[in-house]
Amino acid sequence: IYTFIPVIFIVLYLGYWFYMKNKNSKQAQVVNNTDFKAEFANAEQYKKLCLNSDLSFLKEAMGEEKIDAFNYASNEYGVASALKDGMKDKLKGMATLGTVRFNTVQTPKYLVLSGDNLHLFDTDTDGEIDNHFVFNQARLENSRLIAIPMEGQVQAQAQARGNNVKAYKLSLQTDEKPVELIIYSCLIFTNIPEIPTDPQETIQDIIIGNDFLKQLGDKYPNLKVSLPIFS
């Protein structure tokens, strides 16, 4: 009987894999068939839903300052960079005032556009905000945003949400070397593998991500990119 146990586990695993693959394919089809131009009219509603629930901590962190748009961000910091830096988890010189310490560990980060300023919230390994950086107009006018090739984990994360998600590298100007982040036209953390389970939530996340890109580009032409849902 023991000889059959590995076979049973393999059969169960394959069955689950095919089930999830089929489920994800159906969800992606629903997302791909969405009229995003019509959905974009709901951007303010979707942002409010997020900020009143899962992302309510961003409202607390911003205090009295308004939130025009927001997005998730991840470090562009791979294994090679970690080895080169001697496995450091901090990097100096990443702010607008003085010398502070910016996490290079793969923790979630949040971008909030408020007026002319872009706020970057860095989190610790417990998911709590432990640093708050503000990039003003002068910094943002000298920053860059470019589309990047879809490969590896970046590609996997984007394609899990249909055909309308693109990835970008945002290089934010500082006194020293730029802060380089990976962002998407959707609410995604590159290094937190997550399988979308609700097509409507995916649509909402895509609208919020595109709204962030649009507002950032409208305010700063040097940070303007074509919106995937309109191309």
Give names to the regions the model predicted:
Residues 1-21:
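Alpha-helical transmembrane anchor segments and their immediate juxtamembrane flanks
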Residues 3-9, 173-231:
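Terminal and domain-flanking low-complexity segments
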Residues 21-111:
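Anionic N-terminal interaction surfaces
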Residues 22-24, 32-33, 42, 52, ...:
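Detector for Asparagine
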Residues 97-167, 178:
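Phosphoinositide-binding peripheral membrane targeting modules
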